[in-house]
Amino acid sequence: VGSEMCIRDSSNLLFGIPLHSDFSIDHDTITQVKGSYTETMKGLYNLASIGADIELRIVINKMNYQRLPQLSEFIWKNLPFVAYISFMGLEDTGYSIKNHNKVWIDPIDYQKELEKAVVNLAEWKLDVSIFNIPICLLKPSLYKFAKKSISDWKVCYIDACSKCSKKHECCGLFSTSKIQSPSIKPI
């Protein structure tokens, strides 16, 4: 009861919860923890039951990008209580380096799926954003959802970015990532 009261009294508290797929096997495979999907869903509903603000964080990778449209529909039907939905580009550090061939995908290669998912959620009046994907890698229909999101201490811009008309709005690139998209170009 004490922790419940603490959460209820904290109007500035936002829970950022990763959800990797609408399909439990995919979610568990990505987290490498059997049962993590079920635990995540229980946690989401528990937080919702006490009125907590929830941000769903969907880190896009090679293992989940094809189901982004289905995931958006799942969120709309089953998780309408979430305050924010954030689609996030993958930072190529930590476990993603070890599993690079399994998880890394050039953002240019999942634009169709991302566009469908984001547009669906926006049309259904859910608050949706895109983080950590340079604007030049997005379809123009997605520009308005892109956030300048990479922390100052780990953002970088390559030479091509200096000529870009959208640089002041763009999240840039992770200086910590070992690989960048070859499709980065000025707009």
Identify the residue ranges that each predicted region occupies:
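Radical SAM/AdoMet-radical enzyme domain recognition
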Residues: S3-M88
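Short, surface-exposed linear patches
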Residues: L14-F15, Y37-M41, K77-N78, P107-Y110, ...
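Radical SAM enzyme core and accessory elements
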Residues: I158-I187
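Glycine/Thr-rich phosphate-binding loops of Rossmann-like dinucleotide-binding domains
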Residues: I25, Y95, F174
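Residue-level detector of alpha-helical recognition elements and their boundaries
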Residues: K42, E55, L71, S86, ...
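Extended interaction regions within the primary functional domain
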Residues: D9, L56, S141, A146-K154, ...
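A C-terminal junction/extension of Radical SAM enzymes
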Residues: R67, Y84, L90-S162, K167-E169
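Short clusters of hydrophobic/aromatic residues that line enzyme substrate/ligand-binding pockets
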Residues: H27-T31, W104, Y110, C170, ...
